[in-house]
């Protein structure tokens, strides 16, 4: 039994890190493998993660890590029974993938403006709370080519767009994701999408 692609890990920088890897052949990850992780510190307990299958030869493990700070560094050991398959380390602050934004809502009754709001997925005392910026994807439900991305480069979790910039009488969907530039993070997953009907009426031209 051998590792084909070494584990790569990302952290939500609050309580959870996720590691994925590929084995050299079909593997029952939960029955055959264990990922042992330990904070590099004077006194810290050893933790063990039971991986799940991610495809026939892929494994994924969810590592619970409390009260993460920038200096945290973990040792990682991948075991198959008594055989050590791989040894590495992981620093959560250098591999951040934020949690997805929540509670995306579209308000259509604000004059001729669409107001989109969502929730920052972090509590105010978390390091990422004031570091997130966002991207909003809006698309026509009946025409996949009618899709656009709005970059929200300010911290407020809102976006205002003129209803007239979208087609009238069409159902649209929106979703939002987050990233933390100062942590050199990857993008979060997209939030669940929300749907609305763009009932904006074109003004009549006067002749």
Predicted regions and their residues:
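Pro/Thr/Ser/Gly-rich low-complexity, intrinsically disordered linker/stalk tracts
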Residues: 1-25, 84-128, 168, 186-207
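N-terminal "mature ectodomain cap" immediately after the signal peptide
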Residues: 1-78, 89
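Structural signature of extracellular immunoglobulin-like
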Residues: 19-24, 33-38, 72-81, 116-123, ...
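Residues that flank catalytic or metal-binding motifs in active/ligand-binding sites
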Residues: 31, 132, 192
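Short coil/turn linkers that define WD40 beta-propeller blade boundaries
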Residues: 43, 84, 143-144
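Short beta-strand segments within Ig-like beta-sandwich modules, predominantly Fibronectin type-III
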Residues: 48-57, 148-158
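Beta-strand-rich modules
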Residues: 56-91, 160-186
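Accessory, usually C-terminal, subdomains that scaffold auxiliary metal cofactors
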Residues: 150-159, 177, 185-195
């Amino acid at each position: 039994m051998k590792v084909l692609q070494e584990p790569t890990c990302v952290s939500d920088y609050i309580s959870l890190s996720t590691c994925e890897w590929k084995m050299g052949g079909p593997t029952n990850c939960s029955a055959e493998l264990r990922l042992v992780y330990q904070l590099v510190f004077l006194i810290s307990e050893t933790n063990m993660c039971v991986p799940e299958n991610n495809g026939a030869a892929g494994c994924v493990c969810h590592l619970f890590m409390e009260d993460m700070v920038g200096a945290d560094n973990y040792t990682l050991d991948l075991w198959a029974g008594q055989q050590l398959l791989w040894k590495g380390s992981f620093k959560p602050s250098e591999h951040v993938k934020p949690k997805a934004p929540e509670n995306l809502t579209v308000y259509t009754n604000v004059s001729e403006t669409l107001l989109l709001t969502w929730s920052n997925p972090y509590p105010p005392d978390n390091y990422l709370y004031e570091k997130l910026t966002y991207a909003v994807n809006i698309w026509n439900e009946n025409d996949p080519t009618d899709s656009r991305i709005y970059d929200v480069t300010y911290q407020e979790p809102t976006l205002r767009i003129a209803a007239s910039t979208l087609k009238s009488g069409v159902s649209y969907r929106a979703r939002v994701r987050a990233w933390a530039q100062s942590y050199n993070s990857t993008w979060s997953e997209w939030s669940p999408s929300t749907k609305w009907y763009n009932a904006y009426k074109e003004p009549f031209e006067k002749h």
